[in-house]
């Protein structure tokens, strides 16, 4: 890589890595400031209300919607990863076109291969998280179906824990989709990588934080 590419890659990692480290810290320490933290609190209320109902159709329908969404995104992620694997076979053919528009970055075809490998790994990670999300949603369906209205606090906390873990893996899977934007742009040069990282970070900040707690 060229010196300027090292610089832009480092800045991109600082933007994305620093933002996510801060975001997950806030989710744990001050959950009321983040949408994820507030959603976790609502999930606890949701579990209590679903257990209190004799008719669990609403719970079943809600879980069905969540599992269908995770299934679709997992399938899409693995299909994209498989398609990108096909590009690796013909990387020499596509490298000529890509390197023509990569003005500031390295002209090494091996680096292009590395970028594609990172993109593939990113989608495999997204697929893995969505499948884990499905696993825990299935646990929740079983837990709520087996729980009665006299369920203890320990049982309720276990159900909430499974639901939160399912939601967390879904969130991490979605991060894989978001992070593919700067990685994909990096193929066309480090300047595009930096621009994509900054725009992705700003967009995530505005969607991850409660409106009253945003500073930008």
Task: Walk through the language-model features, giving the residues of each.
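Hydrophobic alpha-helical membrane-embedded segments
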Residues: 5-34, 71-85, 116-137, 178
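Alpha-helical transmembrane segments and their membrane-interface exit regions
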Residues: 15, 199-211
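Membrane-interface amphipathic/juxtamembrane segments adjacent to transmembrane helices
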Residues: 24-63
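Transmembrane alpha-helical segments and their cytosolic interface motifs
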Residues: 61-85, 168-194
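Juxtamembrane "helix exit" motif at the C-terminal ends of alpha-helical transmembrane segments
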Residues: 80-104, 186-194, 200-205
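Juxtamembrane non-transmembrane "cap" segments at the membrane-aqueous interface
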Residues: 89-98, 138-162
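Hydrophobic alpha-helical transmembrane segments and adjacent short intramembrane/lumenal linkers
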Residues: 149-175, 185-186
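A cytosolic-side transmembrane-helix exit/cap motif
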Residues: 212-216
């Amino acid at each position: 890589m060229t010196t300027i590419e090292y610089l832009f890659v480092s800045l991109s990692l600082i933007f994305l890595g620093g933002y996510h480290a801060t975001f997950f810290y806030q989710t744990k320490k001050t959950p009321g400031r983040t949408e994820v933290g507030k959603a976790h609190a609502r999930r606890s209320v949701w579990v209590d209300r679903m257990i209190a109902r004799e008719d669990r159709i609403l719970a079943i329908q809600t879980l069905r919607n969540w599992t269908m969404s995770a299934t679709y995104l997992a399938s899409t992620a693995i299909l994209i990863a498989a398609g990108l694997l096909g590009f690796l076979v013909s990387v020499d053919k596509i490298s000529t076109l890509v390197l023509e528009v990569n003005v500031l970055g390295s002209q090494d075809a091996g680096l292009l291969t590395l970028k594609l490998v990172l993109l593939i790994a990113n989608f495999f990670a997204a697929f893995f998280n969505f499948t884990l999300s499905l696993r825990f949603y299935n646990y929740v369906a079983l837990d709520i179906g087996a729980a009665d209205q006299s369920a203890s606090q320990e049982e309720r906390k276990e159900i909430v824990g499974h639901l939160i873990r399912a939601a967390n893996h879904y969130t991490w899977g979605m991060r894989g989709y978001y992070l593919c934007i700067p990685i994909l742009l990096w193929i066309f040069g480090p300047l595009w990588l930096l621009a994509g990282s900054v725009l992705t970070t700003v967009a995530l900040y505005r969607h991850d934080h409660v409106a009253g707690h945003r500073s930008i």
